[in-house]
Amino acid sequence: MIYKTYKANTYNIYTIKTDKFKTCHMEIVFRNNIDKNDITLRSVLTEMIVENTKKYNTRRKMMIELENLYNAYFYGVTNRVGSSVITSFCFDFIDPSLVKENALDFIKFPLEAVLNPNVKNNEFDLITLEYVKERVKKDIESIIEDPKNYSISKLLEKMCPDTESSININGYTKDLDKITPETLYNFYINMIKHDYIDVYIIGNLDMDKISNIIKNNFKVNILKNHNITYNINNKIIKKHKKLYESFSTSQENICIGLNITNETKFEKNYVANIYNMILEEYIHDVNVQILLERYAHFEIIGISILQLQFPKENK
């Protein structure tokens, strides 16, 4: 594998050249500090960009073009890391050399999708927006169908209210009705201008050529006038809190959470990760599961350390 980094005005292009795979993977990554007030906008915008574009202004046209690119796959993912939010637009495509195609045809697709969404007169397409909002609403509401994730989200809301830890990365249904084609476009422009952006690509490609294609077709001027922090200052809980919630489900869940404070940088980066591995091995041990099911009538479905609080390093 050959690793290279290319400077492109206000963003970087990170490449890994390898012939181990017959497909290539590309990501356009947006990073910023998470904000509860606009997390729903970000969730909707991510879905809008991968739904259609100005050039391919319907889902059908979008899918036909992806099929023409040998069944390429374009999708968006938003995650929270500490107190930051990361939105990635991902593109999986076949190694162009295997089908004797110009790499430009593949690389331009995700770049154009991000820079030229389905916008007219500074407004996103209303029909697409209403469809996407309904889909996002279902995604938000469907968490109750997953007892494990639902209980964890409720645990964080109870433990860490009014902090980044408790923010639902999918957004909030009460905010969906406030989103209009115009407000979504304004948020899009703000994200393009103020999010930190990087491009990642891996595959058997001429990376010098690919980096030039990206530079020529992805021209953004990012105003980096703020720092992105991953630290979350969760308040110390002096008394333990309990939350009971009952609803119809075939599986009951008990979540126990606690804030780990005064970690050193070494403990956070290494000890916690190793301890996570030990816990994961424990819950997947067949003998442990048999004993729990036979004598305790329950099973452990997950134990992990969620690094939600990042205090300053203790010297």
Feature annotation, model-predicted:
Residues M1-L69, Y172, Y185-V286:
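His/Glu-rich zincin catalytic helix
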Residues Y14-I16, K22-R42, R59-E112, N149-K174, ...:
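M16 family metallopeptidases and their MPP-like homologs
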Residues M48-E51, L69, E112-P117, R135, ...:
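Structured segments of extracytoplasmic/periplasmic soluble domains
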Residues N52-K55, P96-K100, N116-L126:
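Short, polar/flexible loop-turn hinges at active-site or ligand-entry regions and domain interfaces
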Residues K61-I64, N116-E141, H226-K235:
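Acidic/histidine-enriched alpha-helical segments
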Residues K108-K120, N217-K224:
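A common structural junction motif
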Residues E134-Y150, D285, Q289:
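Short acidic/His-enriched helical or mixed secondary-structure segments at domain edges of catalytic enzymes
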Residues D177-F187:
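Active-site glycine-rich loop that binds ribose-phosphate moieties when present
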